[in-house]
Amino acid sequence: MAEELSAATSYTEDDFYCPVCQEVLKTPVRTAACQHVFCRKCFLTAMRESGIHCPLCRGNVTRRERACPERALDLENIMRKFSGSCRCCAKQIKFYRMRHHYKSCKKYQDEYGVSSIIPNFQISQDSVGNSNRSETSASDNIETYQENTGSSGHPTFKCPLCQESNFTRQRLLDHCNSNHLFQIVPVTCPICVSLPWGDPSQVTRNFVSHLNQRHQFDYGEFVNLQLDEETQYQTAVEESFQVNI
């Protein structure tokens, strides 16, 4: 299928994954100057936090783009035509349906946990039947995140595989890849738990793989972790009215 995709278009499977959330693109938008593509939600959140720069290459993004990014309709159409392999069960799924598949893929849930990077806190029940995440629990996680933030401004974590502590996200990633790469033990991800949408009952089967897939960047660079999703997007909408189109 990958060969068919390459032969028919100039795209590869990697082009269908958002560089911010590292998931299959949802409502893809494209920057005008550097032509990088992101999920619309990821892009708007990044613009809210990082200002005038592309989240990937730090290229300039116009004021109009920051409020109303251009849909990558060509890419959306390609995603409706071609399939790719689920990263866990290897089932062939149309790219535009991949996120929906993750919600019902038990292997994906076991491997990576909750499939949405910035979930809706009002969802009453997740895809595997876990209890809903309330705004109160999100507030508790924000307090935990702040308490774990060191003098450098970056939160620190304990390795759940050896209990060594005081790791920043990057140091934890390096530590686990160096010392626990082939250690597959069900644990709870300390980074996920510290985030406003984190679920302390969510167990990750392969922690090191989860780190490499989910935590290659600091969420705080793209998301204001003291605001819930609804507040962030309401702010983005309000700011869009101030843009001179």
Curated annotation (Swiss-Prot):
Give the boundaries of each RING-type zinc finger.
Answer: 18-58
Query: Which residue ranges are recorded for the region named Disordered?
Result: 128-153
**Ranges in coiled-coil conformation:** none
The UniProt entry, under PROSITE patterns, shows: ZF_C2HC_RNF, ZF_RING_2
* Cell compartments where the protein resides: Chromosome
So, what pathway does this thing act in? Protein modification; protein ubiquitination
Enzyme Commission number: 2.3.2.27
Q: What does this protein do?
A: E3 ubiquitin-protein ligase involved in DNA damage response by promoting DNA resection and homologous recombination. Recruited to sites of double-strand breaks following DNA damage and specifically promotes double-strand break repair via homologous recombination. Two different, non-exclusive, mechanisms have been proposed.
Q: What is known of its domains?
A: The zinc finger domains (C2H2-type and C2HC-type zinc fingers) bind DNA and mediate recruitment to double-strand break sites. They show strong preference for DNA with 5'- or 3'-single-stranded overhangs, while they do not bind blunt-ended double-stranded DNA or poly(ADP-ribose) (PAR) polymers.
Q: Cite the PANTHER family for this sequence.
A: E3 UBIQUITIN-PROTEIN LIGASE RNF138
- What name has this protein been given in UniProt? E3 ubiquitin-protein ligase RNF138
Recorded source organism is: Bos taurus (Bovine)
